[in-house]
Amino acid sequence: MAKKPVQFTLNGSEKATFVEEGQNLLDVLRRGVGDLTPKYGCAQGTCGACTVLIDGEPHLSCLTLAETVEGRSVATVAGLENGAALHPLQEAFMRNFAAQCGYCTPGMLMAAKALLERNPRPTREEVVEAISGNICRCTGYEAIIAAILEAAGSGSAASKGRG
Amino acid sequence: MPVHVETHANISDAARALSSARDGRFFGGGTLLMRALNEADQSIGTIVRCTDPVLRQVRSEGDRIAIGAGVTMAEIMANRDLAFLAPVARIIGGPAVRSAATVGGNLFAEPPYGDFTTALLALDASVRFAGESGQSTPLQDFLRDRANRRGRVVESVMVPRITDPKALRFVKVTRVKPKGAALMSIAAWLPGSGGRGCRIAYGNMAPTPVRAAAAERALEGASLSEQGIARALQAATEGLTPPTDMFASEWYRREVAPVHLKRLLLGQGQ
């Protein structure tokens, strides 16, 4: 199978790799460049565990044709923390017990980051809508919604993080 | 079978490539096609992509608006001229789906998807293929022969310019809140006073979105009151054979269609 060269920015760092024709971005992130933070859930666009930001917009990496990120900027949870310091969203998730098994958490965090970047003071309804494409099957949604609202209240969740 | 991906900068080149490709499929936003690839769909041999800006344009053409086939649901929601379609785009998936899902892709979406196309059908939209200037195919005709249209590239969808956002009403009926696949969607365009000239379309009541022709006839000249719409509700599923699938049975769909149609026509909360 022919491979194609692709260059993009991942959490602020330049990446150059080869992708297979038809390969999805999630596969390239995890196996190609070693970023294991986006999770493989359903590969159908149903669960949201693989949500990443492409040029600031939320996208399902499992449904993104990898070669379409050529020249674009991709952000994952790996770019949220800054050294030992967690991102305010991550802090809020921790304080609100918004993760149990944690598998949905990377997708929830990136969906929340996308929301807060364009709407730093969302209402509860807007938070629910923002994570409406992300499924959680153990914690339940209330703690997650509370965490996102708390992070929004801190006022610093939108701009932090790399990429 | 390995898949081959071709990217073209010009829509004419993409159209030629698609028509000559063996087992070719056009790539819109990827929400349906990538899913098929992830599931190793062996029927796909070639994927044709197109980066021509014409696919991303929204422009006025007289009293109609041409929406490029590559315009996403998120872009529909952000476009003031398309405010009447924003509530329909908003109910499609979560934000990450809406960043990718396109108007053109939705035209080909099989049940339980294709809610946006249901609204387009109610709006008397028409489809313009690549290379066609000035002419277009009524969406109803397009849908009747949809399976055979896969070999052609859709350039844009033409819709009427609607200034009263209440003229287009839409409901997506799901069992899962806040988002889930529709067991039925209903769109009603009410361009005149009362039911005059109304167009009603159902999604997931047939293999493609379909008009509720009998209900439309019953509404002609009627007022949008409980009494005025009574005959239309009786005729809500006349001439249709709703499917039985994992979301609902034919019986259930027949039972609830008039209930949701009534709420829609009377403007009652869904």
For the regions a language model picked out, list residue spans one by one.
Chain B
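C-terminal structural segment of proteins
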Residues: 1-270
